[in-house]
């Protein structure tokens, strides 16, 4: 079995024949991004850079962000969220597997009506945690104060984008809250459960494929 990133045939516009290129390069050309690991600085720079480039290249066509992540660094996740709100194209967020912690925050950041969870996906939200709990007391107190500010900011974003009262979101974030796709839709984290989208199109068009795959 081959090791590494799979290669697939892809015909670059203007070329007569297809060439073998990395799968991810093909997906990037189709404006499809993947967040499939813990959210760290390197991953954040990679995804935000692609979003900015794709926005410059085409400021109209949608971007698709697939998410299967356990979460990660607070500031890195906020950087992705802010970039999503800044670029001009609408961004679909699609959860497959799990979107936990900051990954659920990014899932929430997709364009309203374009946030999707696959039927067996799991979404989890909880309050931010500090990495400096072993610091000396003065440093720890400063960290707690800053963390409290960030927690309030994130809670307000959840409340605004889900339509839930601030106090409801704040209480829910006191613990790890896992949700199914249907529960996440009822909560307001996503707009569509994947099987609903498939059922809608399959009833009217048995050979339907997502728009982004039609030219393949």
Curated annotation (Swiss-Prot):
Assigned GO CC terms: chloroplast stroma; endopeptidase Clp complex; plastid
Active site residues per record: 101 (nucleophile), 126
Annotated organism of origin: Oryza sativa subsp. japonica (Rice)
Family: Belongs to the peptidase S14 family.
Gene Ontology MF terms: ATP-dependent peptidase activity; ATPase binding; serine-type endopeptidase activity
Organism phylogeny: Eukaryota, Viridiplantae, Streptophyta, Embryophyta, Tracheophyta
Keywords: Chloroplast, Hydrolase, Plastid, Protease, Serine protease
Protein name: ATP-dependent Clp protease proteolytic subunit
Compartment(s): Plastid, Chloroplast stroma
């Amino acid at each position: 079995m081959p090791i590494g990133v799979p290669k697939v045939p892809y015909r670059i516009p203007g070329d007569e024949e297809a060439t073998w290129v990395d799968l991810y390069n093909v997906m990037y050309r189709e404006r499809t991004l993947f967040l499939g690991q813990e959210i760290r600085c390197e991953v954040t720079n990679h995804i935000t850079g692609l979003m900015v480039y794709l926005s410059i290249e085409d400021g109209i066509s949608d971007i698709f962000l697939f998410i299967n992540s356990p979460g990660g660094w607070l500031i890195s996740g906020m950087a992705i969220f802010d970039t999503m709100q800044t670029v001009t194209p609408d961004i679909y967020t699609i959860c497959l597997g799990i979107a936990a912690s900051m990954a659920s925050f990014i899932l929430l950041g997709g364009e309203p009506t374009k946030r999707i969870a696959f039927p067996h996906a799991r979404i989890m939200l909880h309050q931010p945690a500090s990495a400096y709990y072993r610091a000396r007391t003065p440093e720890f107190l400063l960290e707690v104060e800053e963390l409290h500010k960030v927690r309030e900011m994130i809670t307000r974003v959840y409340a605004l984008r889900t339509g839930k009262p601030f106090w409801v979101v704040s209480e829910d974030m006191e613990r790890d809250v896992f949700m199914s796709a249907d529960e996440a839709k009822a909560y307001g984290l996503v707009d569509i459960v994947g099987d609903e989208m498939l059922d809608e199109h399959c009833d009217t068009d048995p050979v339907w494929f997502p728009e982004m795959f039609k030219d393949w």
